[in-house]
Structure formats: structure tokens, C-alpha cells
């Protein structure tokens, strides 16, 4: 699946921490007066990960206009792809006070949800691993939001939609920044060498780089191995379709290497503010399911010291929820009747997300191996579940399927 990244207009403004705390929309000329920095975006060079139309679109984001109709040529637009991005080369290192972005006004306001603004000194992969300035939770049509970057330093400003296939559309980006000075002179650019090749970027202490990733990879007869307790190691899964769910079946095989009396996360799906679908082994060995609030607990079942095959089913209409382990049903419960699992989140194996995509606790991390993960946006019939437990082929999962999985591995995770 491919995603489109749609940029309207982006502007970067510099503000002191005292004058802007977090995101804000309003009078940007007043912001400029507060922090004294000017919008440097129009003097920069824009790039983007792909082009839905002409390459000149990238420049529309820094033309100084807050017009927001893509059909009238006001915005830039990427193809639908995994983590699309738009990047501004400010030509030298700058101290960035704030960045403001303007959303599209004629269509598709929700596409920008979850976008991240990043500042750094590397243009590699669009600066996706640079330091994060802010996250767009939600924007209205034509809305302009400003994000306090707290004087982050770097040459490149990136707007990206991470961890999902999407279009990126921006109508204006404004960057309020001051040139960096070293011993009274402006700092020279060190991100490129004299022959034009990119120099190594300085490491960001709070960023863990992917060690491997793939799109629609066949992992048949392979597994993800999490060798030890960690607050880093995890795998991000990229769904084949939006996870707006009124029913699901989630199945996987796990080989555990954890002591008794330890909480262990099996599957974590979180949107910006909520745990949408978290599956746990509780401290007492029972199974816990948590979907946006209070959870339910299934009776303890004996996990084998070898591979264990588990399945979880849920449907919204009646709230019928079941957990299966190695072909045996633990219990049937009524849970979250009439509710919906919301889309736009991050799916992780190996870690529980206490915040959107982060705040991991190594004492809850998964240790062992996971394989044969499949997920459907429906409850499979009993016959299909029994066939699955017997190792028979029942067709591919339409959200996740082990024979065509899109993912990225972070930290010390091995594909074996």
C-alpha cells in the first residue's frame, strides 16, 4: 500500500519559550515581534519525497501565501507512500524558534493528522531521524498551527507523516529562525563536504534508528527474536488498511523467554491519547485486553515452553470477545459493546506504548520470539479458527499477514 503526504503551506517562526508553549494559531506577525526572528523559509530550498503533480509544487509551500486550495495551485502534494516527507534546506545551520504549517482547505483535512516536524543537520531520507519539534494531532480546513521548537538547531526542517501509508499535502510552511553564530560569526555549513556529498550527521541521543525494514515481505518460516529485556527493542507494523475496526481477529505464535510473575506485552496499538488495542500477559499469568479504558481479564491458561498459538476475537455489535490458546477457548466475555477501534495509531511488537510511539518500560517488554501474525477486520468463523490452529491455510489476513508484512525493526531485534 502507498500513502500520500499532502503539504499545504509551511512557515517556520522563531519564538522564545516564554512567548509560545506548544502549538498555537494566530497572528504570526505578532509572533515575529515577540521573538525577533524572521520567516527564513522563502530563502530556503524545498524538496519532497515524491510528487503527485509537478515538481514546482514543493516551492508553493514557502511562497508566503496562506491560500490553501490545492486545486488552484496553492499547495504541494506527495504520492501515497510510506512516511512521506517535505523538507526545507535553510542553506546554513539555524536556531529555530518555531514552525507554522497551514493545512489544506479544499479537501482531506484528516490526512495531516499525526504529522511530525523535525529539525536536524542531515537530509538523509528526508531528515526522518532528526530531532522532533512537534506533532500535529488534528487540524481543521485552512487552519494554521505554530509549534514551539525551543531553539532546536539544524540546517533542515522536515514535515513527515511517520509509520503509515498516506498522502502528504502542505499549503504553507513558515520557519522563524536565527542564524547560528560561533565566536561572533555565522556558523558555516558542515552537513555537506566540498564535493557535495553528505557528511555524517551528528547523532541524536533520543532517536533510535531502524536496523531493518521492508514492505510486503514474506516472512514464512521466519520469526522476530527479541533477545533480552529492553526499553528500546521493538518492531513497528504497518497495516494494509486503516485500523478503524468494528470487529477483528488477531492471531500469532509466541515463544516466551520471561520469568513467572512478570507483565509482558504481546501486542500494542495506540493512537495519540488512547491504548486502542493492548494484549498482555498479566503478572499472575492471566491474559489482559485493554481497549481505550478499563480492560478485561481472561482466566489463566498454561503457556507451553515451546511455540504457543493464540487468537483474540472481538466484535462491536454485541461486544462478544474471546481468547484462544493452542486451540482452546479461555472464555467468552462482553466488552466494549458499540465501540470502535480508531485508526491513525502505531502498532508495535515488543514494547508497550505509554505515550504515542514511546515511553517504554523494559520490565514489561516482550522477550522471546513472535511469528505467523495475522489480523482480519472481522471475526473468523469457528471452523476457520480450528483450521488455523491445525496449521491449515485459511487465506491471508487483510490488515496484517505474515506472508506479506510491512515493518521496521528498531534496536536489537533479529529476523531468524
Curated annotation (Swiss-Prot):
Cofactor binding, per record: Binds 2 calcium ions per subunit.
Leader sequence residues: 1-14
Taxonomic source organism: Xenopus laevis (African clawed frog)
Protein name: Pentraxin fusion protein
SMART domains listed in its UniProt record: FTP, PTX
Binding site for Ca(2+) 2: 354, 364
Annotated SUPFAM superfamilies: Concanavalin A-like lectins/glucanases (SSF49899), Galactose-binding domain-like (SSF49785)
Binding site for Ca(2+) 1: 275, 353-354
Cofactor(s) needed: Ca(2+)
Region spans: Disordered: 184-206
Record PROSITE patterns: PTX_1, PTX_2
Amino acid at each position: 500500500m502507498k500513502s500520500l503526504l499532502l503539504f499545504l503551506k509551511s512557515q517556520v517562526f522563531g519564538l522564545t519559550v516564554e512567548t509560545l508553549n506548544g502549538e498555537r494559531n494566530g497572528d504570526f506577525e505578532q509572533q515575529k515581534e515577540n521573538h525577533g526572528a524572521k520567516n527564513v523559509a522563502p530563502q530556503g530550498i524545498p524538496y519532497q519525497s515524491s510528487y503527485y503533480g509537478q515538481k514546482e509544487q514543493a516551492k508553493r509551500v514557502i511562497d508566503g501565501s496562506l491560500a490553501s486550495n490545492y486545486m488552484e495551485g496553492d499547495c504541494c502534494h506527495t504520492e501515497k507512500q510510506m512516511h512521506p516527507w517535505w523538507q526545507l534546506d535553510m542553506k546554513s545551520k539555524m536556531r529555530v524558534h518555531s514552525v507554522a504549517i497551514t493545512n489544506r482547505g479544499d479537501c482531506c483535512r484528516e490526512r495531516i493528522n499525526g504529522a511530525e516536524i523535525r529539525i536536524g543537520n542531515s537530509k538523509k531520507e528526508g531528515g526522518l531521524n532528526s530531532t522532533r519539534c512537534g506533532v500535529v494531532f488534528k487540524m481543521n480546513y485552512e487552519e494554521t498551527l505554530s509549534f514551539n521548537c525551543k531553539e532546536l538547531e539544524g540546517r533542515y526542517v522536515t514535515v513527515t507523516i511517520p509509520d503509515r501509508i498516506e498522502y502528504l499535502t502542505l499549503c504553507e510552511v513558515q520557519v522563524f529562525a536565527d542564524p547560528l553564530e560561533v565566536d561572533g560569526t555565522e556558523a558555516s555549513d558542515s552537513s555537506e563536504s566540498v564535493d557535495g556529498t553528505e557528511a555524517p550527521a551528528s547523532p541524536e541521543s533520543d532517536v533510535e534508528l531502524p536496523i531493518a525494514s521492508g514492505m510486503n515481505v514474506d516472512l514464512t518460516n521466519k520469526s522476530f527474536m527479541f533477545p533480552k529485556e529492553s526499553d528500546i527493542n521493538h518492531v513497528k507494523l504497518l497495516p494494509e488498511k486503516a485500523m478503524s475496526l468494528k470487529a477483528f481477529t488477531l492471531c500469532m505464535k509466541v515463544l516466551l523467554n520471561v520469568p513467572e510473575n512478570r507483565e509482558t506485552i504481546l501486542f500494542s496499538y495506540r493512537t495519540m491519547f488512547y491504548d486502542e488495542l493492548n494484549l498482555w500477559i498479566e503478572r499472575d499469568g492471566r491474559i489482559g485486553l485493554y481497549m481505550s479504558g478499563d480492560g478485561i481479564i481472561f482466566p489463566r491458561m498454561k503457556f507451553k515452553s515451546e511455540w504457543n498459538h493464540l487468537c483474540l476475537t472481538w466484535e462491536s455489535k454485541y461486544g462478544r470477545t474471546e481468547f484462544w490458546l493452542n486451540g482452546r477457548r479461555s472464555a467468552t466475555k462482553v466488552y466494549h459493546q458499540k465501540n470502535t477501534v480508531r485508526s491513525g495509531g502505531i502498532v508495535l511488537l515488543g514494547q508497550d506504548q505509554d505515550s504515542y510511539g514511546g515511553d517504554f518500560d523494559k520490565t514489561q517488554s516482550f522477550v522471546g520470539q513472535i511469528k505467523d501474525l495475522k489480523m482480519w477486520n472481522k471475526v473468523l468463523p469457528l471452523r476457520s479458527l480450528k483450521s488455523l490452529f491445525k496449521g491449515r491455510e485459511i487465506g491471508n489476513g487483510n490488515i496484517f499477514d505474515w506472508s506479506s508484512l510491512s515493518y521496521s525493526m528498531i534496536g536489537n531485534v533479529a529476523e531468524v
